Regions:
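Blade-edge motifs of beta-propeller repeat domains
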Residues: 1-12, 43-62, 102-172
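Short, solvent-exposed loop/turn segments at the edges of secondary structure
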Residues: 12, 36, 62-64, 96
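Beta-propeller blade termini
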Residues: 13-22, 64-74, 83, 103-104
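Acidic carboxylate motifs that coordinate Ca2+ or other divalent cations, activating on Asp/Glu
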Residues: 25, 29, 75, 79, ...
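Hydrophobic beta-strand segments that make up the repeating blades of beta-propeller
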Residues: 29-34, 80-84
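Short consensus segments that form the blades of beta-propeller domains
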Residues: 32, 58, 89-95, 167-171
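Structural signal for beta-propeller blades
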Residues: 38-41
Length: 172
């Protein structure tokens, strides 16, 4: 399709999309799903796609994997099934306490590194992975944080450095 889109810079890691006439005006609109992003709707107006916010859906980020369009209840309107990781994972993110991922070349080599973190009950940003796993991926951490106890009682900015975290791509 060589139609034009308005700003798509907010899209993150797209996993699936479906063309469907969600506004019932006779042309094919686009719905996009992905990780670290809300279900994103693009309304087709005169062969140009404009992002449209849908109340109750457009403000919820998820780990969306799939979308399917079908008239499931046979009432003449299109229904959508959206597959999301949901709560069946070891991280258990919530709207109040989301999972945070920082991604960058933390040890300045050619290998892209990720750091998983969550907010503690006291409001500190803490690593999810332990010292052993973290230092396997980013060896400089072994020199910076010497003991398991020190790692266990340190925050993400203390471990990785505030400047490195600010520079990194951040998903929540």
């Amino acid at each position: 399709i060589d139609e034009k889109f308005d700003d798509i810079s907010t899209l993150k890691m797209i996993n699936d999309a479906v063309f469907s006439d969600f506004d019932n005006d006779g042309d094919q609109d686009l719905i996009v799903v992905g990780e670290w992003m809300p279900v994103t709707f693009f309304e087709n107006k005169d062969n140009k796609f404009y992002q449209k916010k849908i109340k109750g859906v457009s403000n919820i980020n998820g780990w969306f994997q799939t979308i399917t369009a079908s008239d499931l209840d046979e009432d003449g309107s299109v229904d959508y099934i959206i597959g999301n990781w949901g709560k069946n994972n070891k991280f258990h993110p919530t709207k109040e306490k989301p999972l945070h991922i920082y991604a960058d070349y933390f040890d300045d080599n050619s290998s892209f590194d990720i750091a998983l973190s969550k907010v503690s009950k006291t409001g500190d940003l803490l690593p999810i992975r332990g010292k052993e796993c973290s230092t396997q991926q980013t060896p400089f951490l072994g020199d910076k944080v010497k003991t398991f106890k020190e790692f266990a009682t340190s925050t993400m900015p203390e471990i990785y450095g505030s400047k490195k975290l600010e520079k990194a791509s951040h998903f929540e």
